[in-house]
């Protein structure tokens, strides 16, 4: 079957250009004009009406909550929400129950993802059994079973010896190691950023050093082990300084930033509001400015949402007792496009690179994040001019725990194709 996308706007040579895209057998067959003259009529035609067509977004940091926490999310609902947000590939974090910490459990998750997901799912395995700081997983076995990377996300590996051995094991088999960086001895059970805002609200704070100290430890271990070390959801200026220096020294370090850390800071927390509780927390305005600067100068390699759905009950009451985490996969593009591209801090092409091309390249997801002939037809069609208000009622995730509800934004995802097939669009809304 062939599909022709007509009158698409694509980002080429630093600007938007109009073209057609021909899809055959799930892959991009041709990009250009008057393709029907060369290839004949297509079986199906999608009129893009001059809307923007992007390579599908790639999010390497998503919590699908399945198995074990399906009241929050499932593979099906989380990946449909991903398609709604324009994502065609997501990395499923391993903080589920049971933890994918053996080859058998990883293989089970890979099979379930293939059967139940609406988009491509790259499966993480944990670094250690049970996501503790003790026994390492069988790195060769979990890679053979289909893991694309390892992470203990949600928990920092607390002992340097365990982390170094893990890095050596991951490096030996060529698996990236993605780290939730948090030193428990410096954490002190805080619920938001330590500082004047936390003091005013009477809430326990989380110091910047609890993150930055573990980043500093880990980059030295990464240099010694040769692993691809990836810092999850970087949030502090100090962490960025360490990462910037590590890159300058030639250490194989990459990092991601989440949309909420680019768009919000602790000064936006004017009351005890669980919808603004996440880990790492919203930091100071100075930290937020440093993250934006890191995005602009290339220190930050990619954007990842840390999509963390919860039930309504888990996000009620006080920040002292509510669960950490917010959703983000359905709001990421629109909020970032509105705040960064419409204000000319970033070009559209650079945002697409950060949300699609670079995460795919750096994590070895070589078939994702590209709008080129021969690549899988993982594409997102977006109305860049449509302004709308983010509403909980339109979200397809089970979790509606978003601080962006009510925000006016531009950039409405109209349709998402995965391997040339409709994953989200009008037909899925019937």
Curated annotation (Swiss-Prot):
PANTHER family per UniProt: ALLANTOINASE
Gene Ontology annotations of biological process type: 'de novo' UMP biosynthetic process; purine nucleobase catabolic process
SUPFAM superfamilies: Composite domain of metallo-dependent hydrolases (SSF51338), Metallo-dependent hydrolases (SSF51556)
Enzyme category, top tier: hydrolase
Signal sequence, renumbered to the chain: none
Any GO CC annotation of this UniProt entry: cytoplasm
Keywords on record: Hydrolase, Metal-binding, Pyrimidine biosynthesis, Zinc
Annotated function: Catalyzes the reversible cyclization of carbamoyl aspartate to dihydroorotate.
Cofactor dependence: Zn(2+)
Protein name according to UniProt: Dihydroorotase
Residues where Zn(2+) 2 binds: 153, 180, 233
Organism the protein comes from: Lactiplantibacillus plantarum (strain ATCC BAA-793 / NCIMB 8826 / WCFS1)
Details of cofactor binding: Binds 2 Zn(2+) ions per subunit.
EC number(s) stated in the UniProt entry for this protein: 3.5.2.3
Family: Belongs to the metallo-dependent hydrolases superfamily. DHOase family. Class I DHOase subfamily.
Pfam families referenced in this protein's UniProt entry, alphabetically: Amidohydro_1
Gene it is expressed from: pyrC
Catalytic activity annotation: (S)-dihydroorotate + H2O = N-carbamoyl-L-aspartate + H(+)
Catalytic-site annotation from UniProt: 306
């Amino acid at each position: 079957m062939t599909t022709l996308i007509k009158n698409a706007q694509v980002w080429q040579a630093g600007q938007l250009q109009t073209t057609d895209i021909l899809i055959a057998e799930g892959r991009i067959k041709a990009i250009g004009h008057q393709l029907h003259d060369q290839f004949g009529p297509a079986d199906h035609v999608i009129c893009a009406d001059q809307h923007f067509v992007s390579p599908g977004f790639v999010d390497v940091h998503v919590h699908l909550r399945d198995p074990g926490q399906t009241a929050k999310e499932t593979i099906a609902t989380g990946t449909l929400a991903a398609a709604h947000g324009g994502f065609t590939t997501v990395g499923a974090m391993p903080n589920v129950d049971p933890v994918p910490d053996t080859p058998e459990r990883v293989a089970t998750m890979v099979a379930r993802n293939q059967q139940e997901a609406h988009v491509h799912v790259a499966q993480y395995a944990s670094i250690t059994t049970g996501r503790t700081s003790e026994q390492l997983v069988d790195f060769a076995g979990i890679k053979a079973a289909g893991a694309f990377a390892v992470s203990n996300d949600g928990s920092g590996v607390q002992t340097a010896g365990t982390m170094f051995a893990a890095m050596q094991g991951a490096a030996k088999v060529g698996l990236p190691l993605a780290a939730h960086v948090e030193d428990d001895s410096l954490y002190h059970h805080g619920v938001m950023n330590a500082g004047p805002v936390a003091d005013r609200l009477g809430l326990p704070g989380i110091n910047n050093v609890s993150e930055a100290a573990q980043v500093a430890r880990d980059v030295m271990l990464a240099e010694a082990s040769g692993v691809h070390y990836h810092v999850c959801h970087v949030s502090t200026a100090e962490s960025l300084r360490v990462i910037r220096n590590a890159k300058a020294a030639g250490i194989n370090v990459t990092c991601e930033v989440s949309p909420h850390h680019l768009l919000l800071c602790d000064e936006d927390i004017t009351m005890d509001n669980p919808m603004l509780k996440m880990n790492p927390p919203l930091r100071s305005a100075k930290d937020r400015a440093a993250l934006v600067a890191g995005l602009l100068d290339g220190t930050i390699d990619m954007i990842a949402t840390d999509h963390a759905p919860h039930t309504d009950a888990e996000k009620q009451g006080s920040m002292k007792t509510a669960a950490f985490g917010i959703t983000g996969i359905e709001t990421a593009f629109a909020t970032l496009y509105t705040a960064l591209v419409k204000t000319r801090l970033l070009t559209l092409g650079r945002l697409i690179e950060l949300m699609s091309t670079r995460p795919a390249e750096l994590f070895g997801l070589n078939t994702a994040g590209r709008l080129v002939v021969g690549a899988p037809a993982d594409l997102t069609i977006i109305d860049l001019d449509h302004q709308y208000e983010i509403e909980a009622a339109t979200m397809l995730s089970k979790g509606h725990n978003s601080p962006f509800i009510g925000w006016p934004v531009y950039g409405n995802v109209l349709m998402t194709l995965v391997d040339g097939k409709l994953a989200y669009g009008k037909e899925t809304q019937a």
